[in-house]
Amino acid sequence: MRKFWLLFAQATTIGLAVLFIINTLKPGLLSSATRNGIVTLHESVNTSTSQIPTAGFSAAARKVMPAVVNIFTSTEIKKPMNPFMDDPRFRFFFGEEFDSSPQRGSNLGSGVIISHDGYILTNHHVIEAADQIEVALADGRKAKGRIIGSDPESDLAVIKIDLPGTIPAITFSRPDQAQVGDIVLAIGNPFGVGQTVTMGIVSAVKRNHLGLNTFENFIQTDAAINPGNSGGALVDVNGNLIGINSAIYSPNGGSLGIGFAIPVSTAKKIMEQIIQSGSVTRGWVGVAVQEITPELAESFKLGNIQGVLISEVVRGSPADKAGVHAGDILTMVDNKQLLTDSSSMLETISSLSPGKVVVFKLLRNQREVGIQVQVGKRPRPKKLE
């Protein structure tokens, strides 16, 4: 009996050893039925782990850098007159320390050459109030820039330079080509140190409600963007323009990996209007709207109806003349369903041509009303003094 148990123990030991070796070296030989409770994972058969160019991004950078410029602006700053400067005795004791003669302030930014005849796209805030503009190209050439026009509500502007010889120009990507996760390069002149290329990814698209501009549809990126990068290029790995770097989120002024660029689809529309007429024309009806919250929907007994609540009507505006009232629910414009946010309403109305007559479909006192509204021209924003 003792011999039997000895043989059994030896056989069991050998069997377990064989199973251990097979499971270690050839786990696929074991039937999945012997591993109850273990989830089978499917590994990718694709051997390619990245679409990053084997030579890095130097080709894309070389393609783009000649078309990205440094912009230096200066503005005359008038100091308030000191009331004591007219007194000779005051000037005798204090000299010209309180001189109120004009001084000059300077600013810097970046821009993108969009055509071989010298048109440059940049941010409105880069050239705002500038009375002198100098543009420095990557090849060392410099030229005076003149403002063709600007659009404060999208923070875009176009300037022009005149130079002998060839002027490089950037290539545009197809509109709305950028996708979350795409690798991008940002090119500009951060802090005035000179042309700089940084790399990151597209973190998000269609960012709005940031309070930066009236019209917002930003590409968000973690590519380093710093003061001086404004107006520079955001490009894909092929060196095609996908956006104009415009702003960063930063409590201390440095890059925290949250930058915003105006997409090329928006930039092209604004740019073309500015080049043609020197300004941007948008539709306007004179209403303020707010989004309909679940509480408002219940209060107005809207059910599944989508739209925006008209909270204010400007007196004398096209909407006022047509009979639109505060408290109306706007659901459609010319039979086009509105999204449920104020940004979509703003985009819809601003895209209409002034003078066009459109039909507003309204819900008033739980009854559907159709009103014809003649679209007006959106007023330019007032400058802050």
What are these regions (language model features)?
Residues 2-306, 311-315, 322, 333-336, ...:
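Serine-dependent protease modules
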Residues 327:
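Conserved catalytic motifs of ABC-family nucleotide-binding domains
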